[in-house]
Amino acid sequence: MSLNIETTQGLERRVAITVPTEIVSKAVREEFKRAAKNVRVDGFRKGHVPAHIIEQRFGASIRQDVLNDLLPRHFFDAVIAEKINIAGRPTFAIETFEEGKDLVFTATFEVYPEVKLQGLENIKVEKPTVEITEADIDKMIDVLRKQQATWAESQDVVKADDRVTIDFVGSVDGEEFEGGKATDFVLFMGQGRMIPGFEEGIVGHKAGEQFDIDVTFPAEYHAENLKGKAAKFAITLKKIENMVLPELTDEFVAKFGPNTKSVADLRAEIRKNMERELKNALVSRVKQQVINGLIEQNPIDVPASAVEEEINVLRNQAAQRFGGNAQQTAQLPRELFEAEATRRVQVGLLFSEVIKSNELKADEERAKAMIADIASAYEQPAEVVEYYSKNEELMNNIRNVVLEEQAVDAVLAKAQVTEKVSSFDEIMNPQA
C-alpha cells in the first residue's frame, strides 16, 4: 500500500491510498466463498449455487461489501502508521476499482491542530477572597422566612414588598394593544416582573383607587410593535396585602430538617451550605478566567466536524430542557450554538495539552474529597459515597472534573494571579 498526503485547506487533509490488486482480489474471492455458503436461490440447495449465478445475482453487492470493508480498514491503517490525529469521519472517493487492477481511492478528512501552549505567564486571573459574615446568614434566613410568609389584607398605601391585585388596560397612542389587558392580576411588588415604571407607579396608592401610569417600553422589548413606545396603563387597584413573616422560633426552624432543632442549628446548616455554594462559585469564576486567558494567548483553529458534533450535543441538551422531540431538535438553528460549540472544542484541546504537557493524572484523594463534598448535601451522605464508589461511570466523571481542576491549578502556577476581597453577594449574585 502506498500513501500520499495532501493538505487542502486549514485542517482539511486528503490522502490518496493505493491497495494492491492481490489484496483486493483475495478479499473478493473470500467474500464470494462466504456468499456461496450462505446465499439462497430457488432451485438450488444452500451452499450449492453455481458460481456464475452468484456472480449474476449478487456480484455487485458482494464487491460493494468488499469495498465497504477495504476503504475504512486501509484508511485507518494508513493514518495510524503515519500517526495522524484525525477528527470526525472521512469521506471516500473511488478512483479505480476494477478486476485485475489496484484499488485507488482518496479520503478527505480533518485533523486536530497541533497545540503548543504559550503565553501562560501573560494570563491575568483575579482570585476573590470571601468571608461569609453573620449578616450574610441573616439575609439567607430572611429569604427562608419570605418563602414561608403569609399575606394579610391591608388598607395602607402600597409599599415595595406588598402583593397587590389589579385590573389594567394598556394603550399606545390611545389604542389598546394585544397582551396589554388583565383582570384580577396578582403582582408581587419589588420583583421587577413588569416593565420599568409600572410597579413604581402603583407604590403609594390605596385599594379602590383608579389611576393611570405612564411608562416607556424598553428598546429591547420582545414585541416589535412596542419597542421604545410610550404607553399608558389604566389601573384599578383592588386589593393590597402585606407580607407577614414567620417568627424565628424552634418550631419554624424544625421545618428545615430533622437535625435542625434550634436557631443555632439552622444558622450552622446555612453557613455550611453557603460555604459549599461559595466554593463552587469561586472555582467556576477562576476557571472561566483561566479558560479565557488560554484562548486569548493560544488562538487555534478547530475542526469543523468536531464543532458540528458539539453543536448536536448542545442542540439535544436544549431540546431536553424545553421538552422538545427529535424533529424539533433538528429545527433549532445551528447558529444558536456555533459560538459555544467552537469554544468548547477549543477548551477541550487546550486543557488536553495542559494535562499532557504537565503529565497530570487524576488525584484519587482529591476525587474522594469531591465525592464527600457532594454527599454532604444529602441526609445520608455515607450512602451517597458508597453509590459513587460502586458506579465506575460516575467515578470517571468525578476524575475528569478533578483532572480539569488540576489543569487549572497548573495554569495558575504560571499565570499572574491577584487576590481581591469580595462579598458573598458579589460572587453569588454578580448581575445584581
UniProtKB/Swiss-Prot annotation:
Residues 161-246 form the PPIase FKBP-type domain. One of its GO terms (cellular component) is cytoplasm. It catalyses: [protein]-peptidylproline (omega=180) = [protein]-peptidylproline (omega=0). Coiled coil: none annotated. Transmembrane segments: none annotated. Consists of 3 domains; the N-terminus binds the ribosome, the middle domain has PPIase activity, while the C-terminus has intrinsic chaperone activity on its own. Involved in protein export. Acts as a chaperone by maintaining the newly synthesized protein in an open conformation. Functions as a peptidyl-prolyl cis-trans isomerase. PANTHER family: TRIGGER FACTOR CHAPERONE AND PEPTIDYL-PROLYL CIS/TRANS ISOMERASE (PTHR30560), TRIGGER FACTOR-LIKE PROTEIN TIG, CHLOROPLASTIC (PTHR30560:SF3). This is Trigger factor.
